[in-house]
Structure formats: C-alpha cells, structure tokens
Amino acid sequence: TSIRHRPPDPQAMYAGREVFAELAEPARKRGMKLYVRHYQPSQEATRYLDGFESVLAVDHAGRPHNKPCWNHPDYRGYLLGTMRDMFETYPLDGLQYGAERPTPMTDVIFGGKGFICFCEHCQARGKRSGINVDRAREGGKVLCDLVTALTKGTARTPDGVMAEFLAVLLKYPEVLAWERLWHDSGNEVHKLLYDALKAIRPQVEVGRHVDHRQSSWDLFYRAGSRYQDMPDHVDFIKPIVYHDILGPRLQQNYLEPLQQGLLKELTLPQSLDLFYAWFGHSRDAEPGVELLAEGLSPQYVYNETKRAVEGAAGRAAVYAGIGLDIPSGSGWGTDVWQSDPEEVYAVVEKAFTAGAAGIVASREYEEITTASLQVVGRAVRDVWETR
C-alpha cells in the first residue's frame, strides 16, 4: 500500500510507550479482555497518514470525498496491514470495527454532497457487475441537481416532490444499482478483516459497530446493510442506541434536511410522525417536535436492540451501545448533557429485555459521570440477579 503511518509526535501523550502491551496484564488480573476500536478515518487522517488523500472516494463530478473508497486496493491494504500488525504484535482479544459514514444516496439527500464513488476501482467493479457506469454517473448528477434545487427553492415539481424523486430512480435504475454496489463493497471489507484476524488467532472476536445514523434514521442503510447479513463476518454486533441524544440528532440530521428537501411538502410534525411509522416507534410513547430536544424514551432502545437481535438470529451476539452523558450540539458535541439516572437504569433494563447479550457504556469514558456509571452497574447487577 502507498499509505504510511507517520511516526508519532514525540511530545504527544504516551509517545514512545506500548499502550496495548502495558494494558494487557492489568486487564487480565481484573478478568477483563482487551479490545481495540478502529474508527473509519476521514480526510482529517492526512495529519497522521502519508498518502491517505490518494484513496479518498471520488464523486460524480470528479471531486474528492472526505471518506476513503471501499474498493481502493491501497485503502484495503492499509486497513488489513494495520490490523494484522496490531494483532500479531499485541495480545489483543478482539476488534470493534465500524465505518461511520453515510451511503451514497444519503450523502446526497441529507448532506448535499456529490454521488460517490467513481474512482477507477469502483468504475471497474461496476462494469464487472454489469452496471452502465455512465448512466449511474448521470443519474447521480440528476439526483444531486434535484436536491440542490429543492434546497434553494428553485425546483419545478408539478407532480410533487416525491414523484419527482421516484422519476429519477425510474429513469436511472443504475443509481440504486450503484448504491447496492457500495453496500456490497463495504460488507466485503468487513469480511476481509474478519478472515484476516481469524487466520492469526481463531479465538479473536471481531465485531461491527453500527453507528447512530445506521441504526436509527438511515433507511438506505437499513435496507442495504441489514443485520441478518452481518453474522457471516462478525462475532458480535454493537448497534448504537443513544436514546436521549437521538432527539437533537434527529432534528438536526434528519428532520431539518428533509424539511428543505424531499419532505418539504410536509410539516415538521408530519415528518416526525412519518419517521415514527417508518422506523417502528409508537407516536404515543415518543415526544413530539416541541419535546424532541429532551430525547426519545427507553422504549426506543428496546425496539432497536430487538431488531438487531432478531436480525442476528443467534448467529452473532448483540451488545447494545447505551449512550451516557453525550454532549449535544453540532459536530462532536459542545453542550454538556447529563443523562437522567432513572432513564439510564430503564434503558439498560430494556436492552437486556430485548435480548442483548451485553451492553457497552458509550460514548467516551471521559464524558461519562461517575453517577451514570454507578446506575449502569446497579442495573446490570439487578438484571443478572434475576436470570
């Protein structure tokens, strides 16, 4: 691969120390296993990886995307080489790998970005799959133009916005074929990682992180990368089920973009009702638009955990990612959020009731208050005492 890890900054925290090696023995003494979480890098990784810009996806207009291409051989080489080296060098028990990224369709619909990926490697794979690449590119452009015009208020939609959207897909079925190709490519990367690590140590546990977008509000992810298709390349699945922060995230990342685009003919309350209906939540149990900032109920955690458990069908464990004290606001989060202790207890209980084999206290340890951790511990002990 052309990608190279840069030597760490000698002034950085823990520089020159083998952190995984140092953690192994203390973890063993406490009866704990040591897992690594590999986060899908974005364009920002160019600060740490030489050559990373060469593997970024390319949109329909030839512009670089901010995430790497699934099919680029140098990206796959970097990913597999890095993971092999880590598991051959350190006494790691498992990996949680997860790519937090929208699909090509949702990148356009929710993010206003170009339709991806049309690098030489994706084009070659598309041709091998029998897809007309030029038609896929043209359809992607038409879709982008429609969403842009809707956002600007210049679109002409005499038959209605949704009919106009469906007309694009009917005229260019290659767009959906390209979306399918993207999902297949991503699942293939997960399988390559799984096989590579099992070849090193069969007892290594390989898991898939399903981020908040994928688990909770992205219909294209729900249709294209389904839980029932994951157990052939994972030992466990960790769906993100952050109940309280989902309210603000839903408003910012789902309702507002659609209000400017494909669902602009609906009011915000109507769009929210449609979301609840599409994603299997009770309108009576969940908040209206005016209370959405307070988050969703523990029942949401039950619903999404149960969906993952039923999809895995006993072929992979499900560890529900419970959100604790996750800041709200744009980006990574800037506004401090203290989770309600009673709700924390309830969501842990709901996750296990739905069939989860375990939970993951999420998102970041340094964000979580001692009070929240104590409630989680009490809830887990209470659940296991009744089993």
Model-derived features with residue positions:
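Aromatic- and acidic-residue-enriched segments that line the glycan-binding/catalytic groove
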Residues: 1, 42-65, 99-166, 249-268, ...
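The substrate-binding groove and active-site-proximal loops of carbohydrate-active enzymes
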Residues: 1-17, 62-80, 171-187, 284-298, ...
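Active-site-adjacent "subsite" loops/lids of carbohydrate-active enzymes
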Residues: 3-18, 25, 33-90, 99, ...
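Conserved, mostly hydrophobic/aromatic
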Residues: 27, 79, 86, 95, ...
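Aromatic-lined carbohydrate-recognition surfaces of secreted/lumenal glycan-active proteins
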Residues: 32-43, 96-100, 132-153, 177-222, ...
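Substrate-binding cleft/loops of secretory-pathway carbohydrate-active enzymes
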Residues: 46, 50-53, 104-106, 200-250, ...
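Aromatic- and acid-rich polysaccharide-binding/catalytic face
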Residues: 98, 136-179, 224-293, 357, ...
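Substrate-binding cleft of secreted/luminal carbohydrate-active enzymes
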Residues: 233-252, 277-384
